[in-house]
A protein has these predicted regions:
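Short loop/turn segments at connectors of secondary-structure elements within structured domains
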Residues: 154-156, 206-208, 224
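Exoplasmic/lumenal beta-rich domain surfaces
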Residues: 161-195
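N-terminal signal peptide c-region/cleavage motif recognized by signal peptidases
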Residues: 16-18
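Internal, hydrophobic beta-strand segments that form the core of beta-sheet-rich folds
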Residues: 163, 204-219
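Short beta-strand elements
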Residues: 222-238
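Short, hydrophobic beta-strand segments
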Residues: 196-203
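Bacterial N-terminal signal peptides that target proteins for export
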Residues: 1-7
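N-terminal "mature-chain" segments and other terminal, solvent-exposed stretches
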Residues: 22-153, 157-158, 165-168
Length: 239
């Protein structure tokens, strides 16, 4: 029975990967998004229960989804393998209330995806161990955000948020009220497979969560949402 269950999980994973191979779109490479960091570690395929995952936050994310779906490996690995498809279709995407309804509080880092077959809710699990990229502000108090695009979309716009000092990702999942907008960009040019933006961080310092929204201007209203854990410092430092 155990062998059959694992086989079913792997079959589900293969089915999901095949179904989504042509529709993946990208993720924040710097500061690295949670799901991309977990994916790049490449330590989640075995053992099936995720016990071999080294980063405690990535391991907790995996096991959250694994246990929710009756120890299904395919469900759990999907949130890592689909690192570039943290998306939600919102037809009325210019209405912020519609965005908040589609991506409710405590589901921001999963882009509101928490259903069987597309459950990325492990990214919403509170943990003190999410990898935090060191972000050194330049002389203009800005940081360079790099978004790796596996499929470019234009026209589009970007909204960048930063968590408030009161928010602690170790204790609670992210909510909209935890965020403040720090940047907005229209039709950023794709260069060498990346969208890059200089985000003004002003006087912000310390550990925060950077929340990136990339919104397509199309009838379906497809948008992409990423959480990046960061530590903002005043001068250049090694990440």
């Amino acid at each position: 029975m155990k062998i059959r269950h694992i086989a079913c999980g792997l079959a589900f994973q293969a089915l999901c990967l095949g179904a989504h191979a042509e529709t993946r779109h990208g993720a924040v490479e710097f500061p690295v998004a949670r799901q991309l960091n977990c994916y790049q570690a490449n330590d989640f395929n075995w053992p099936a229960d995720g016990s071999g995952i080294k980063n405690p936050a990535c391991r907790a994310a995996y096991q959250e989804v694994y246990k929710k779906h009756d120890n299904n490996q395919g469900q759990a690995t999907l949130q890592f393998n689909q690192w570039n498809e943290y998306a939600k279709n919102i037809a009325d995407y210019n209405d912020f209330e519609a965005v908040k309804k589609a991506i409710p509080d405590h589901q921001l880092c999963s882009a509101g995806n928490s259903v069987p077959g597309n459950d990325k809710s492990g990214m919403d699990v509170p943990s003190p161990d999410w990898h935090a990229s060191t972000v050194a502000k330049d002389q203009n108090q800005a940081m360079r955000l790099k978004f790796k695009a596996t499929m470019p979309h234009d026209p589009s716009f970007w909204v960048i948020y930063l968590s408030k000092p009161s928010y602690d990702p170790a204790k609670a999942s992210l909510t909209w009220n935890d965020l403040e907008e720090v940047g907005r960009f229209d039709n950023v040019k794709l260069v060498g497979g990346y969208y890059e933006m200089d985000v003004d961080l002003k006087d912000k310092l310390g550990k925060r969560v950077l929340y990136t929204r990339w919104q397509r201007n199309d009838p379906a209203g497809e948008g992409f949402y990423n959480c990046s854990d960061i530590n903002i410092v005043a001068s250049a430092a090694k990440k």
